[in-house]
């Protein structure tokens, strides 16, 4: 092989190495998303329920979904969830791995190891960038999952994620696709901090201080990451769901006068805590943990 042939091959391998974290993130995210979609649909409906009026549980919602449309009804919005995974999931995992490797390289040049603070920076930065780009897919997913809660005359009945994207942008304006961007951004940063950062740190600490086998270390680290990710990000996921579900023309989520029930993140937090109590923000944490756990 000549030098001229080696150079393109080297460049190709370098490009593949750069793209590999994004490819892995995309593939693993899509598999996890498909597996947990029923739990996510239940979680969203639980978060939208007014617990001061309604007595609902994970099992009652699952039963109602099955009665309404069978097992396929549990997969409402799957096309939007896959789109979300392609955009948000790919970016958050791929960018985290890329940032972490670059920071580790710089640490080696200084003669030190990657610190927890640097890992946290990689996680928070990756989550923030992925959230900004992926917010439209979050809005689409929430709308498709909750469409069945509205009266038949008000249901949009989106045929696919692309159809939802087009119709929301057309009827409500492009900026409607960035509804709830604030809590989505904070949630993504907190998930990445609690999930990815703690997973890497826990696995590293377990390797240094225990004699656990690699598979066990990975499982324990994933459990720690899932718990921390859920605890830190649950309130922001709750607010995100409430904000992104709002449509001015729907009296089921508005005030009946064309106004939105919640004006923003803090208004939503205040009204929910005032009406339903502080514990409401964490009341549905079990299905939320089951939702994000497989992504750990």
Swiss-Prot record:
Inducing stimuli: Expression is induced in response to 2-benzoxasolinone (BOA) exposure. Expression is also induced in response to 6-methoxy-2-benzoxazolinone (MBOA) and 2-aminophenol (2-AP) treatment.
GO CC terms in record: mitochondrial inner membrane
Organism: Fusarium pseudograminearum (strain CS3096)
GO biological process annotation, one example: transmembrane transport
TM helices/strands, residue ranges: 12-32, 122-142, 219-239
Alphabetized PANTHER family for the sequence: MITOCHONDRIAL DICARBOXYLATE CARRIER-RELATED (PTHR45618)
Taxonomy, superkingdom: Eukaryota
Any matching Pfam family: Mito_carr
Function: Solute carrier protein; part of the Fusarium detoxification of benzoxazolinone cluster involved in the degradation of benzoxazolinones produced by the host plant. Maize, wheat, and rye produce the 2 benzoxazinone phytoanticipins 2,4-dihy-droxy-7-methoxy-1,4-benzoxazin-3-one (DIMBOA) and 2,4-dihydroxy-1,4-benzoxazin-3-one (DIBOA) that, due to their inherent instability once released, spontaneously degrade to the more stable corresponding benzoxazolinones, 6-methoxy-2-benzoxazolinone (MBOA) and 2-benzoxazolinone (BOA), respectively.
Keywords for this protein: Membrane, Mitochondrion, Mitochondrion inner membrane, Repeat, Transmembrane, Transmembrane helix, Transport
Family, per entry: Belongs to the mitochondrial carrier (TC 2.A.29) family.
Keyword Repeat on entry: yes
Solcar-type repeats, residues: 16-102, 114-205, 213-296
SUPFAM superfamilies membership: Mitochondrial carrier
Mode of membrane association: Multi-pass membrane protein
Gene3D superfamilies given in the database record: Mitochondrial carrier domain
Transferase found in the keyword field: no
Coiled-coil residues: none
Protein name, entry field: Solute carrier protein FPSE_08119
Broad class of the protein's primary localization: mitochondrion
Subcellular location: Mitochondrion inner membrane
